[in-house]
Amino acid sequence: IRDRYDMTRFPYGETVVMLQPAVHVDDLGDKVEDWGNPVETVFHNVAIYASASQEDEAAGRDSDYEHWSMLFKQPVVGADYRCRWRIRGVVWEADGSPIVWHHPMSGWDAGTQINVKRKKG
């Protein structure tokens, strides 16, 4: 029986989709990212919450961007700063690289945090 506060997953979390560009080689042999038909990876039971840009807060100004954060209990293989994310039907840009939370004293892996942003309006 799982404890009601089981921290191995977020049982009431949401489903999000990681979007990664397809990569093609052009006529010159260079790799080119193609966002026309991105590769989609689905993640379930993700915690999502609104967050703020630290840069804007430090400067004391409002941002032109809306910021959210996602917490994953499972590994997020392939996620990086170039990914886009579909959350509640809206596409967001990654805001930096994923952050893996690992407790230095106990070795507990708390999960992965991914910050995203999108232009307001």
Model-derived regions: residue spans:
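N-terminal intrinsically disordered, low-complexity, charge/repeat-rich segments that act as generic
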Residues: I1-V17
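Short, conserved turn/kink motifs that form compact alpha/beta structural patches or helix kinks used as
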Residues: Y12, Q20-G121
